[in-house]
Regions:
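Active-site rim helix/loop that mediates acceptor-substrate recognition in acyltransferases
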Residues: 24-54
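Short amphipathic alpha-helix that is part of the acyltransferase structural core
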Residues: 1-35
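Conserved GNAT acetyl-CoA-binding A-motif
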Residues: 97-111
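Conserved beta-strand in the GNAT
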Residues: 50, 55-65, 69-76
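A structural micro-motif
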Residues: 2, 46, 100-101
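Conserved acetyl-CoA-binding loop-helix of GNAT-fold acetyltransferases
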Residues: 77, 83-96
């Protein structure tokens, strides 16, 4: 089972989030490290979740929470767990957590 844990840059998992962020997304699809840290710590509408499975870090999700929807901005898992249904499980957990619709942007496989 996956656990969603809200984190900030001072939390232990954040270094793993930063590393995966840098390997899972090209530079043009992410903020600078400094800007990402700032929005994570200072913007009350921006949420970073570490994804843990049996106590091990397996990925992260970043979201913008608005009054009418939650926008899932970045979502990545470590290579070892890809294709094992974690993405569906995480989206289900997010849908249970929020009373407003989730909005996702899908990028084609050519970019993965």
């Amino acid at each position: 089972m996956i656990e969603l844990k809200k984190i900030k840059t001072g939390d232990a998992e954040y270094a793993q989030v930063e590393h995966l962020f840098g390997t899972a997304f090209p530079p043009e699809e992410r903020r600078s490290r400094e800007d990402q840290r700032r929005v994570t710590d200072e913007n009350p509408f921006f949420i970073t979740y570490a994804l843990n499975q049996e106590g091990a870090f397996v990925g992260f999700v970043t979201c913008w929470q608005g009054p009418d929807f939650v926008y899932v901005e970045h979502f990545a898992t470590v290579p070892e767990v890809r294709g094992k249904g974690i993405g569906s499980e995480v989206l289900g957990l997010l849908a249970q957590q929020y009373t407003v619709p989730l909005v996702l942007e899908e990028i084609g496989r050519a970019h993965v």
